[in-house]
Swiss-Prot record:
Coiled coil: none
Protein name: Acylphosphatase
Active site: 20, 38
Catalytic activity: an acyl phosphate + H2O = a carboxylate + phosphate + H(+)
Name of the encoding gene: acyP
Keywords: Hydrolase
Transmembrane segments: none
Record organism: Marinobacter nauticus (strain ATCC 700491 / DSM 11845 / VT8) (Marinobacter aquaeolei)
Family: Belongs to the acylphosphatase family.
Lineage: Bacteria, Pseudomonadati, Pseudomonadota, Gammaproteobacteria, Pseudomonadales
């Protein structure tokens, strides 16, 4: 089983619309580990680890997000996996 790590930066109307909570729920459904947090500049940052197909599914979902979100851009970067996470959670 191949484990990858993706770093995602989501911009648009993504704070105050349950984007973090929805991302956490979606990532857990996909069996991913990592975290999601709001950034001071209004973006949402995500670090997720898991199988490539599940990471791709999360990346695709991030372009839509929850119902009230308006996503302008999702920047993705693949990084070496560290497998340091045991679950997926919202951080501050």
């Amino acid at each position: 089983m191949t484990i990858n790590r993706w770093h995602l930066l989501v911009s648009g109307k993504v704070q105050g619309v349950y984007y973090r909570a929805s991302t956490e729920q979606k990532a857990r459904e996909l069996g991913l580990t990592g975290w999601v947090r709001n950034l001071p500049d209004g973006r949402v940052e995500i670090v997720a680890e898991g199988e490539p197909l599940q990471l791709k599914a999360l990346h695709e979902w991030c372009h839509e997000g929850p119902e009230r979100a308006v996503v302008d851009e999702v920047a993705a970067q693949e990084l070496p996996a560290t497998q340091e996470f045991t679950d997926f959670r919202t951080t501050h």
